[in-house]
Amino acid sequence: MRSTQTYAAEITAPISSSSHGEWQAWRSKRAFLARASAPFEILETLRLKDGVPHNAVRHLMRMAKAAAHFDYPFDRELAVTTLARLAASRPNGVWRVRLLLDRSGRLHAHANPIPPSPQAILLQLALRPLEDAGSEFVRFKTTRREHYDCFAPSDPRVFDTILWNERGEITECTRGNLAFRLNGRWITPVASCGLLPGVEREVRLADGSLVEGVIQAADLHRAQGVAFINSLRGWIRANVVGLDSPC
């Protein structure tokens, strides 16, 4: 069983059933309009090393969940075959693989070489919250990334941006998840804060090297360590620029 640590107090106000119904109707309408505004594909990005796709089973499971959520046809056996063919054509080296599923159920994959991951990176804290961090386009990985693109660092030395929600809780980066060393443990933001549950994050939660918790942006200076994590690059030590006390 996963343990969850909380580093923030939450206060909620009662909501009437009629107000709740109106809220849910508004959310459903907004989600419909967001989906209809532009076509998108479901996406998985994974590491291929010497012909072996990293965590392929977990990536395909996540794609299947996204396909079910968006009502996209998904043929798992075809996805396995598509990945296997691509892997066989890249028997050597390290590659960034993008596996995409469109609305009609068509799958395609392509690979690009990736340079070695840096030993450490710089991250910056977003200046404003990510609105609607609970959006389906945050919780599921797709080619719709406008909500992330506007947080791209302008400084070329900065690798990515640390996002936070409207409650002031840290969520993720635009290209991966986060871990913070607090009170002697590595904590990753809990999924309910509004983030994409990454495959590498899930692996480390399962093996016990990470636990979930709520981390306030205002408390970042207390972290004894920071790491950026994703399935493509693994675990990378990070420093956060612009804080009074470096992490």
Task: Show which residues each predicted segment covers.
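Helix-start/capping segments and mature chain N-termini
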Residues: S19-R96, L100-C247
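Conserved, well-ordered active-site substructure
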Residues: M1-P14, R233-V240
